């Protein structure tokens, strides 16, 4: 089975001889381009982050999440859903803008520990190393398309946001689903929805634990697939009890049969979702899973690849902004988190690069030709982000295409 299971490309970025202009650099540059054109992401073997630093980051995260609730709630941010969130004791997360910059990390520390705390230095150093890795990969990408002149402008037009996440082990009798498209820019907010489904007079209680991502606005509607093996398709309107989410509504789509079991394979997959299928809106993201897996990436053929954590590996994933910048040459892949571990706490960290406000994303002329006609109109990332908050943006099969696609007719 293992040999038949699809896997993401694994690219070694840890070789000390990997320097611009070297033969190794040229080979890796080609591998990165092919992996991103084929999958929109790849696994990276790295040595920029030592095992010792990884262990220190985990301890720092555990220390963060062990703080009293009132202390954690001091992690606030003017940007909606970009600070700390926790609901129902199932998941919680912190957000740190410019986590790679020491001064900004200190500001985050002051929110939680006014007296100071040295452990945050480990997180800042970790973010700094991941940022260096991200910039190297984006440099490789631009070089591979022959637009070296654009590298400095591109790298200087972005900033980073880090997300630290903790998924608490679920009870065996919970059916877990999630909502939250853009993990690239913020927290996962957890909410409850309880619903009863009647089938020939039988009442079946369904509890749904929902992770709501940072980009959910008031009055938003979101679709959640819940696979309960009951053979009768039904729509259940479940209210999201989320303080930060206003009166957003989750539509729970279930399938129920007389035995009310969760035996179907598809039902089990839906029931284990910790974050549903989505594309990121960022330029890029680097994701680290500590020991417990969960991330799955969808291929062009519609197959799901489950990414198993391995020592000294991270996942580089392209977002919608990078897809637009590269004129569609690099896709932003659909991915999800499916939590199958029932008795273990899952920790994960992600660093996302985003265009700065006011910077216009426009494909370089070298990427537009007869074979690759212009696919997207120029846009400000903030406008894309705001469009994503609208009903039209939420309902669109592709937010990017609906917002600025040449075929969108805007």
From Swiss-Prot:
Record-level Gene Ontology MF annotations:
dioxygenase activity; metal ion binding
Domain Fe2OG dioxygenase: residue ranges = 258-355
What EC number(s) are associated with this protein in UniProt? 1.14.11.-
Q: Can you tell me which residues bind Fe cation?
A: 278, 280, 335
Q: Keywords for this entry? A: Dioxygenase, Iron, Metal-binding, Oxidoreductase
**PROSITE patterns listed in its UniProt record:** FE2OG_OXY (PS51471)
The record's annotation in Pfam families points to: 2OG-FeII_Oxy (PF03171), DIOX_N (PF14226)
Gene3D superfamilies this protein is in?
Answer: B-lactam Antibiotic, Isopenicillin N Synthase, Chain
Quote the record's cofactor note.
Binds 1 Fe(2+) ion per subunit.
Q: What positions does the entry give for 2-oxoglutarate binding?
A: 346
Q: Please verify whether the record's keywords include Oxidoreductase.
A: yes
* Cofactors required: Fe(2+)
The record's function comment reads: 2-oxoglutarate-dependent dioxygenase involved in glucosinolates biosynthesis. Catalyzes the conversion of methylsulfinylalkyl glucosinolates to hydroxyalkyl glucosinolates.
Q: What is stated as this protein's family in its record?
A: Belongs to the iron/ascorbate-dependent oxidoreductase family.
What this protein is called in its record is: 2-oxoglutarate-dependent dioxygenase AOP3
| Native source organism of the sequence | Arabidopsis thaliana
The gene that this protein is the product of is AOP3
